[in-house]
Regions:
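Membrane-proximal interfacial segments on either side of biological membranes
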Residues: 1-171, 175-208
Length: 208
């Protein structure tokens, strides 16, 4: 009952807002400084956002969101010079270090279509990747993944959320040692992925 009252009160909020934080403690002790957000709320929900903050050493976070007045869809874009503070809550990205992150999403009610791109990153001590490489009889790369890590030039993920299921229509990772192409889905109960893993030496033989 109280929750219904709270939701009803929020749905009545219509105003422009401006937020200014001098310091926000982000995950993994990455402090976000001088974070400023200008936005617009209609019926209790954001319809416009423009935000920016800095992690220090010329590393920034930018967030923009706009709503199309005709179809009511929202268009969200996020850019970050640091990936880990934004991905640390997701087990799927465990082991990702370094790199720059680009994220775009078309939000339609509770559903969305999104693209995630990470450039120039390392994958270090990632249990899922180590297991995958071991099963593929690539023990040398598995050892590297547990130690110094595997470097990748780019990771691109196309995803679509419908109800409680996140459909991963394409996962593409390209690196000097190995490349991956996968698809699948994840839900609160299970994660299922399938695809192709190609070591660089195999790819070189195919090209030459």
């Amino acid at each position: 009952f109280n929750k219904k009252i709270s939701n009803n009160n929020l749905s009545k909020i219509n105003k422009d807002i401006e937020i200014d934080f001098s310091n926000i403690i982000a995950p993994l002790s990455e402090n976000l400084k001088n974070f400023k957000l200008i936005g617009k709320i209609e019926k209790g929900k954001f319809t416009k956002i423009s935000a920016k903050g800095g992690f220090g050493e010329n590393n920034f976070l930018d967030i923009t969101m706009k709503q199309d007045k005709k179809n009511k869809k929202k268009y969200l874009e996020i850019y970050s010079d640091l990936t880990r503070p934004l991905l640390t809550e997701y087990n799927f990205f465990k082991g990702v270090t370094g790199g720059k992150l680009f994220y775009s999403s078309i939000i339609d009610g509770d559903n969305y279509n999104s693209k995630l791109k990470i450039e120039n990153f390392n994958l270090i001590n990632a249990p899922a990747m180590v297991k995958l490489l071991s099963l593929a009889d690539l023990s040398g790369l598995a050892d590297l993944a547990e130690g110094e890590g595997l470097s990748f030039d780019v990771l691109e993920i196309k995803m679509e959320k419908k109800e409680n299921i996140l459909i991963l229509s394409e996962i593409l990772a390209l690196g000097p040692s190995i490349s991956l192409l996968m698809d699948g889905y994840t839900s609160p109960e299970v994660t299922s992925l399938r695809g192709t893993l190609v070591p660089a030496k195999t790819l070189n033989k195919m090209i030459s």
